[in-house]
């Protein structure tokens, strides 16, 4: 459960991320593909080389979806319903992969934001990403 302080920290964090969505999102995807190569199977039609248009475009979509979720912290299920349907019914992505991408996104933020990514902000974002992963996995039950 996200506290009022968590929500405040997440809003502050996303203000720092907003101008870098494509960069951070694509870097998180690239990191996931390198660290967890089995995740590449969900992208057979993508050029997965670093810096490819497809990875950059999808990274931007991922980060934008997270940004929309930050704007809807009190109603994540509704905000992510369409994405949950897409990943569960059409793409059939194993929900374990959401946590892998979340870990990679954390590393990207820590790398780029440095001291601006405080332990409290990290903890709030971790709770948020866990909540997002849970919502995305809801339709699998």
UniProtKB/Swiss-Prot annotation:
InterPro entries named in the record: Globin (IPR000971), Globin-like_sf (IPR009050), Globin/Proto (IPR012292), Hemoglobin_a-typ (IPR002338), Hemoglobin_oxygen_transport (IPR050056), Hemoglobin_zeta (IPR002340)
Pfam families: Globin (PF00042)
Expression sites (tissue/organ): Red blood cells.
Keyword terms of this UniProt record: Heme, Iron, Metal-binding, Oxygen transport, Transport
A GO molecular function held by the record: iron ion binding
Domain (Globin) ranges: 1-141
Any Gene Ontology biological process: hydrogen peroxide catabolic process
One GO CC annotation: hemoglobin complex
Residues reported to bind heme b: 58, 87
Record carries keyword Iron: yes
Protein function: Involved in oxygen transport from the lung to the various peripheral tissues.
Family membership: Belongs to the globin family.
Assembly description: Heterotetramer of two alpha-D chains and two beta chains.
Protein's name in the database: Hemoglobin subunit alpha-D
């Amino acid at each position: 459960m996200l506290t009022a302080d968590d929500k405040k920290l997440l809003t502050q964090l996303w203000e720092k991320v907003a101008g870098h969505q494509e960069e951070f999102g694509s870097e998180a995807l690239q990191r996931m593909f390198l660290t967890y190569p089995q995740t590449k199977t969900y992208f057979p039609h993508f050029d997965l080389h670093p810096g490819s248009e497809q990875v950059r475009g999808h990274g931007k979509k991922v980060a934008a979806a997270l940004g929309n979720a930050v704007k809807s912290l009190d109603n994540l299920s509704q905000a992510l319903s369409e994405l949950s349907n897409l990943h569960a019914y059409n793409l059939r992505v194993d929900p374990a992969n959401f946590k892998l991408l979340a870990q990679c996104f954390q590393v990207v933020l820590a790398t780029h934001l440095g001291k601006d990514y405080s332990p409290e902000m990290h903890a709030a974002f971790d709770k948020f990403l866990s909540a997002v992963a849970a919502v995305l996995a809801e339709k699998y039950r």
